[in-house]
Swiss-Prot record:
Its EC number is 3.5.1.2. It catalyses: L-glutamine + H2O = L-glutamate + NH4(+). The keyword Hydrolase applies. Belongs to the glutaminase family. Homotetramer. It comes from the Bacteria. Disulfide bonds: none annotated. It holds the Pfam family Glutaminase. One of its GO terms (biological process) is glutamine catabolic process. This is Glutaminase. Substrate binds at residues 61, 111, 155, 162, 186, 238, 256.
Length: 302
């Protein structure tokens, strides 16, 4: 496995320079584009990694999975009264569909859906950002995971579109807390800094029927784990989820920080990171690396 990971990084490294680092978040625009890492973690605790897999980066929308899991833990099926679990087919920050569907987001992985989930969690936790940080630390076994306040502040200063989505949902009665407070929590979630190794470990409960070996806790039950993996498979890569299923064939979640996490149910998790994005906002070299790994090992849910 170690040799395979090294080979795959060598094969996809020439793609660096063909994508573009996220620049609509100023604090992310200065990230060095030539970084590339990959980590594989098995449900039995075996870890393999290559490249920049130990270097922390901004997880951005990958955090939406953690938020969703927290909401499922305390509210269960009730959360689906306020949002759906269908693919949107629209850009992750689109307002058009949200207006047409009267403030009910299609799924928890587009921005509007993630904001509803954060609104649900805001009603539950006295300090949502700290609760999320502590939850993630338990999942990955790394007590040094923190949120980058500079990135969070940068995102908050450029919050107009997310604020518009939140206020639109509030006008339809689907947003209950103070919009600015929820946005602050949301951006602190997105600004969490984790490495490929951290994320591969943190997501391993989704490969093990909801059980996290690091914390010894049953994070989700088996049915809930299946549901989260299903939403990742259909909606985890913005409006490129179909292409990702076609090329990689695994449940996954991406972020504009360049990270992608993928789950092989019953076996492994794998995280890749390369900051340069394609036109859909997903890591260009990251998708290529996952495609090669899936083909070489024969990992696919299809």
């Amino acid at each position: 496995m170690q040799q395979l990971l090294n080979e795959i990084l060598d094969e996809v490294r020439p793609l660096i320079g063909r994508g573009k680092v996220a620049d609509y978040i100023p604090a992310l625009a200065g990230v060095e584009p030539d970084q590339l890492g990959i980590a594989v973690y098995s449900r039995d605790g075996e870890l393999f990694h290559a490249g920049d897999a130990l270097r922390p980066f901004s997880i951005q929308s990958i955090s939406k999975v953690f938020s969703l899991v927290q909401a499922i833990q305390h509210s269960g099926e009730d959360i689906w009264q306020r949002l759906g679990h269908e693919p949107s087919g629209q850009p992750f920050n689109s307002l058009v569909q949200l207006e047409f569907e009267r403030g009910r987001p299609r799924n928890p992985f587009i921005n509007a859906g993630a904001l509803v989930i954060c609104d649900i969690n805001q009603s539950r936790f006295a300090a949502p950002a700290q609760s999320m940080r502590d939850f993630v630390r338990r999942l990955c076994g790394n007590p040094e995971v923190v949120s980058d306040s500079v990135v969070a502040r940068s995102e908050y200063q450029h919050r107009s579109r997310n604020a518009a989505a939140a206020y639109l949902m509030k006008s339809f009665g689907n947003f209950h807390n103070d919009v600015e407070a929820v946005l602050l929590s949301y951006f602190h979630h997105c600004a969490l800094r984790m490495s490929c190794v951290d994320l591969a470990r943190a997501f391993c409960f989704l490969a093990d029927k909801g059980f996290c070996k690091h914390s010894g806790e049953q994070v989700l039950n088996e049915r809930q784990t299946k549901q989260v993996n299903a939403i990742m498979a259909t909606s985890g890569l913005y409006d490129e989820a179909g292409n990702f299923a076609y090329r990689v064939g695994l449940p996954g979640k991406s972020g504009v920080g360049g990270g992608i996490i993928a789950v092989v149910p019953g076996r492994f998790t794998v995280c890749v990171w390369s900051p340069e994005l394609n036109g859909a906002g997903n890591s260009l070299a990251g998708i290529a690396a996952l495609e090669k790994l899936s083909e070489r090992i024969g990992w696919s849910i299809f």
